Regions:
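Juxta-kinase regulatory segment immediately upstream of eukaryotic protein kinase catalytic domains
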Residues: 1-11
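Short, well-ordered coil/turn elements that cap or connect secondary structure elements
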Residues: 3-5, 45-48, 150, 170
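Intrinsic-disorder/low-complexity loop/linker signature
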Residues: 5-6, 28, 62, 170
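A structural micro-motif
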Residues: 8, 51, 171-173
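ATP-binding pocket architecture of kinase catalytic cores
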Residues: 11-105
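Active-site acidic catalytic loop and adjacent metal/ATP-binding pocket
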Residues: 19-23, 142-179
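A cross-family kinase active-site recognition segment
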Residues: 74-135, 146, 150-153
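Short proline/glycine- and basic residue-enriched helix-capping loop/turn segments at helix->loop/beta transitions
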Residues: 137-141
Length: 179
């Protein structure tokens, strides 16, 4: 891959997206590199929700490449998910007006509760949609759905399972995988 930076070597990191790399410099310094990541990554790093963004550049083929600090630590386990730091990070994410403003400027549309129910109805597997219990729950949700207020809208990650959290050796925790 031509990065325009002869010193940086990229090694793929196994994962679902196929867009994550460990970048290595000749002096041994490592960085985390992701192709075509979320455009709100700089804001997430400013809010200390995601690791620090070091740089971003557009490649000749039009793809975007972002570099973040390399974190030494561990992926959280299901048992770790009840920690207060997790609650604090999610609270910061959900209450961040600057991130909401940034998403709005980037053209992201808000999804209302009605939108989410409709999306589920259209994309859920037939076996789930035809399940009697789930059908009753969906009917109840449709009847009791709350009103939507844009001023109360929040950002959500969408996949906060334990494997999307990293704890550094110094004890800091970050939410990752913003695809």
């Amino acid at each position: 891959m031509d990065l325009g930076d002869n010193e940086l070597t990229l090694t793929p990191i196994p994962g679902k997206s196929g867009k994550a790399y460990m970048g290595s410099y000749p002096d041994g310094k490592r960085i985390f590199v992701k192709m075509n990541t979320s455009p709100i990554l700089p804001g997430l790093a400013r809010e200390q929700i995601a690791p620090q963004l070091l740089w971003s550049r557009r490649l000749a083929d039009g793809r975007d490449m972002c570099a973040q600090e390399w974190l030494t630590g561990k992926i959280l386990t299901p048992y770790d998910m009840n920690r207060k730091q997790i609650v604090n990070i999610l609270t910061r994410l959900h209450r961040s007006r600057p991130l909401m403003t940034q998403l709005s400027r980037l053209g992201y549309a808000m999804e209302t509760p009605v939108d989410l129910l409709q999306s589920w109805q259209e994309t859920a597997p037939d076996a789930l949609r035809k399940n009697h219990f789930i059908s009753e729950v969906m009917a109840d949700l449709r009847q009791t759905i709350p009103g939507f207020r844009e001023d109360h809208a929040t950002i959500v990650h969408g996949d906060v399972r334990h494997s999307n959290w990293i704890e550094t050796d110094s004890g800091l925790i970050y939410l990752v995988d913003w695809d």
